[in-house]
Amino acid sequence: MKEYQVYLERARSRQQDFLYPLIFREYIYGLAYSHNFNRSIFVENLGYDNKYSLLIVKRLITRMYQQNHLIISANDSNKNPFFGYNKNFYSQIISEGFAIVVEIPLFPELSSSLEEAEIIKSYKNVRSIHSIFPFLEDKFTHLNYVSDIRIPYPIHLEILVQILRYWVKDAPFFHLLRLFLYNFCNWNSFITTKESISTFSKRNPRFFLFLYNFYVCEYESIFLFLRNKSSHLRLKSFSVFFERIFFYAKREHLVEVFAKDFSYPLTFFKDPLIHYVRYQGKCILASKNAPFLMNKWKHYFIHLWQGFFDVWSQPRTININQLSEHSFQLLGYFLNVRLNRSVVRSQMLQNTFLIEIVSKKLDIIVPIMPLIRSLAKAKFCNVLGPPISKPVWADSSDFDIIDRFLRICRNLSHYYNGSSKKKSLYQIKYILRLSCIKTLACKHKSTVRAFLKRSGSEELLEEFFTEEEEILSLIFPRDSSTLHRLNRNRIWYLDILFSNDLVNDE
């Protein structure tokens, strides 16, 4: 139990007790408004055009405490005639202030008291999106079952706020936070719809992103603890693990009770062949064990979300499939394990044997139809795939138009260069190339055929298909067979930290 006590003390040491006074500090809202600060965090700047006033921020907080709905109410208009300010603007400023105040004790890069070595160490945790695929290629060929899990969203956003209670023990801070949410975010309803959560996340991206990531981090901390110390106890006994405050004390008491009252001994087992991967709002659990243990973890997840986080989750949101028979989607790719069968002839003395060898290979395929839907949504083609022009870019110069298309093509090419089959990637590049030609023809008020005759189809946009080969030729010998082999193999770019918007569309 010593390791449990160390884990508990480490968790308690991170609790912060005095965050409320920071809400009334002017520099907090200056940081929220500053373009440079927003650029340093991985959230896009909201682009405020107005100047903020700390006096109005303090007045808003005072009015929330007074509950004067003649001045501020959930149904108020965006422009309050009494004060003459934009309520949405100041609600975003206050929400950014809340996010910054809570981020200060939790993110090392925001604290000036840390040593430089620790700051550098914190940035090493930022890893490429593509770093996960070599791991999957190495591990998934030895596994049998995969569980595709959709992380449920809370029925009420206040559940996300309540999770902070285990780490931040400042009652006035949470009282003010709830007043703000009920006054500005219309949280009076018992159940918050997914559309309302989406609207709130768009208006307050930084604040919502912090709350959601904290929710995911909290459930993963419990899951990883149970993963490292899994028990063979019955499922009904799992409910006592949910209350985090007395988590470890109850676990120790449970072991003592079962050891005294039951004849069979309590044993703990570790499962080294189980792997967990999370991306966006989904996660994947893969294992080599029998389906029984995968179903066990499925029920653990459901009871964890329902019993501890008050989040409704249905069993159909967790699918358990055999890797050799089903494919799953991950970060814009389709992945499945393919069985390669080969026959080897073996001869011993005068006897000849035919031995069948079965090997596994992870196939990583570019999904052509979702990408075409994404291109159609971005107005590069129609829903069936034929390219169309981009009239909104026609006001730019020819160089800017080509550069825009080339950057999109380069990003998609880098992201999908790890695919097993490049045919789908070539189709996407072909659509972008023709869309670029049609956009240029639209700008010059000409047909595509006339424009190609005047400009020369051989030289125009040739870099769309030759850039990758030119880059590889600078690194490797100029041998056609070498370039052909590199073009067929998977190339993972370990400097990709963000996925393209076209990749995120599902």
Swiss-Prot record:
The molecular function GO annotations come to:
RNA binding
Where does this chain mainly localize? plastid
| Keywords of this entry | Chloroplast, mRNA processing, Plastid, RNA-binding, tRNA processing
Q: Does the keyword Electron transport apply?
A: no
Check the record and name the InterPro entries matching this protein. Answer: Domain_X, Maturase_MatK, Maturase_MatK_N
Instruction: State the GO CC annotations.
Output: chloroplast
What does the UniProt entry say about where the protein is found? Plastid, Chloroplast
Pfam families reported in the protein's UniProt record: Intron_maturas2, MatK_N
A biological-process GO annotation: RNA splicing
Sequence similarity: Belongs to the intron maturase 2 family. MatK subfamily.
Function of the molecule: Usually encoded in the trnK tRNA gene intron. Probably assists in splicing its own and other chloroplast group II introns.
What is the name listed in the Swiss-Prot or TrEMBL entry for this protein? Maturase K
Gene transcribed to yield this protein: matK
